[in-house]
């Protein structure tokens, strides 16, 4: 009840939540990247985001910020859900299909937020399998959430062209999510260097590695 009241009645400033998520995400990535470089933990040549937050001390910052971001992201998903079901915004609550779609979208949004928390707390150097599991929840849940939200926007929110931008972003996210595991595994098995977190342009499968990272960043 207190959370519903906060979302539906005290909505001042809730529109800033997505902006705050983006700002904190940028801070987390850039801070960990430069800190990892100073500690000589990664290669400066376009590393994975997870590589930049896999060792102490940057892993502490990475984990803390991502945990905060995951909570804020969950609030974003929930606030959009409540906003959508508000009768004052012309959403037909008597239509079972719209309500069901909104709830399904919320579930995948929470899966995405939970996956981010798993990624934050299980670094790849600690428990690699759990880190991959969390990444799957994060990017997979986020991609499906984006597709459902795009459909809802197109089908039920009239006089809005924002669905076009959402459709483009949703397909970029889905396409990147599908390609990442394939190209990432190929690059990993073909790698012939000494430290997999310090890829160099001359390493074998370097182009595939960079291609994978581009899709990972696009998905993020």
Place the predicted regions along the sequence by residue.
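Alpha-helical transmembrane segments
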Residues: 154-161
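Non-cytosolic membrane-interface motifs at loop->transmembrane helix junctions
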Residues: 126-138, 161-163
């Amino acid at each position: 009840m207190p959370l519903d009241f906060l979302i539906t009645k005290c909505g001042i400033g809730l529109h800033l939540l997505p902006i705050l998520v983006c700002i904190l995400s940028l801070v987390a990535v850039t801070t960990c990247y430069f800190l990892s470089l100073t500690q000589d933990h990664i290669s400066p040549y376009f590393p994975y985001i997870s590589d930049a937050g896999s060792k102490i001390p940057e892993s502490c910052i990475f984990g803390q910020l991502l945990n905060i971001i995951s909570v804020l992201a969950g609030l974003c998903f929930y606030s959009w859900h409540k906003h959508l079901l508000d009768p004052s915004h012309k959403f037909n609550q008597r239509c079972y299909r719209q309500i069901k779609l909104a709830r399904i979208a919320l579930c995948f949004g929470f899966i995405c937020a939970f996956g981010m928390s798993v990624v934050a707390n299980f670094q790849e150097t600690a428990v690699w399998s759990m880190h991959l599991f969390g990444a799957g929840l994060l990017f997979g849940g986020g991609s499906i959430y984006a597709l459902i939200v795009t459909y809802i926007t197109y089908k039920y929110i009239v006089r809005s062209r924002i669905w076009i931008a959402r459709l483009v972003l949703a397909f970029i996210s889905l396409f990147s999510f599908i390609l990442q595991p394939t190209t990432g595994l190929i690059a990993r098995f073909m790698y012939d260097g000494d430290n997999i977190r310090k890829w160099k342009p001359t390493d074998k499968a370097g182009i595939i590695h960079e291609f994978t990272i581009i899709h990972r960043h696009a998905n993020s």
